[in-house]
Amino acid sequence: MLQTEMKVIQQTEIADKVYELILSGECVMDMSPGQFLMLKPSRSDLLMRRPISICSYDKSAQTCILLYRVEGDGTEDFSKLSSDDTIDVLGPLGKGFDIDRTPEPKTALLIGGGIGVPPMYQLGKELAGKGVQVTFVNGFQSAKDSFYEKEMTKYGTVHIATVDGTLGTQGFVTDITKNFLEEPDVIYSCGPKAMLEAVKASFPETKTYLSLEERMACGIGACYACVCPKADDRNKQFKVCEDGPVFRADEVSL
């Protein structure tokens, strides 16, 4: 974990209120799939950092890409960043996806919903690099909300579901996965709680890994703002920012 200043290389709106932010900094060298950064808004009245998942990184260039949706004052502040600006960053944080499983999977299903899609990109890239056959299933509300379909096709097969049917299959991600004839060796998912519950119920929990989207304040496990009940004892809790955000499905109670 490192508090540092990162330089803005470029920022582009790539979907409705969804921005692609490219940053440069030495902390990229410590990144792994499924981790996140805590970004500090520039406005003095916005005291809390905002957690943004890491979409991808290039360690040789020391750059990373963050994708986020403008949903409040903090992310609205980030959307005003432009080339050569700097931003105060804490991270990389959290325990991400374990891609060094034994035995090594031959097939992997990556399910993302909305702003839970970004961390699936780097994960899929690294799995494909290890020879794993990757299938992406991405869910959005509408075609205007979709992003990174073309980028993901470089590393696997991509399926899209939209609630209004304007792109791909009408419905939810599980309306696609329920028609798959073969069960993958491992399942990874990130997205809204309702989607994660559906994924958890659809596949064997011992080979399903969920990245939880909880509101965070500190990002380092000090404030207990992002807790999640443990599956074996709901009176005990995980701190999502420190113990996760990635958990095996049978470890957590959603």
Curated annotation (Swiss-Prot):
Binding site for FAD: 50-53, 67-69, 74-75
Keyword Glycoprotein: no
GO BP term (any one): 'de novo' UMP biosynthetic process
Residues where [2Fe-2S] cluster binds: 218, 223, 226, 241
UniProt KW Nuclease keyword: no
Alphabetized InterPro entries for the sequence: Cyt_c3_hydrogenase_gsu, Dihydroorotate_DH_ele_sf, Dihydroorotate_DH_Fe-S-bd, Dihydroorotate_DHASE_ETsu, FAD-bd_FR_type, FNR_nucleotide-bd, OxRdtase_FAD/NAD-bd, PyrK_electron_transfer
Coiled-coil segments: none
GO MF annotation: an example: metal ion binding
Biological pathway: Pyrimidine metabolism; UMP biosynthesis via de novo pathway; orotate from (S)-dihydroorotate (NAD(+) route): step 1/1
Keywords attached to this entry: 2Fe-2S, Electron transport, FAD, Flavoprotein, Iron, Iron-sulfur, Metal-binding, Pyrimidine biosynthesis, Transport
Cofactor-binding details, from the entry: Binds 1 [2Fe-2S] cluster per subunit. Binds 1 FAD per subunit.
CC cofactor: [2Fe-2S] cluster; FAD
Entry's transmembrane regions: none
Domain FAD-binding FR-type: from-to ranges: 1-99
Highest taxon of the lineage: Bacteria
Listed HAMAP family: DHODB_Fe_S_bind
Family (UniProt): Belongs to the PyrK family.
Role of this protein: Responsible for channeling the electrons from the oxidation of dihydroorotate from the FMN redox center in the PyrD type B subunit to the ultimate electron acceptor NAD(+).
Subunit structure: Heterotetramer of 2 PyrK and 2 PyrD type B subunits.
Protein name: Dihydroorotate dehydrogenase B (NAD(+)), electron transfer subunit
Species this chain originates from: Listeria welshimeri serovar 6b (strain ATCC 35897 / DSM 20650 / CCUG 15529 / CIP 8149 / NCTC 11857 / SLCC 5334 / V8)
Lineage: Bacteria, Bacillati, Bacillota, Bacilli, Bacillales
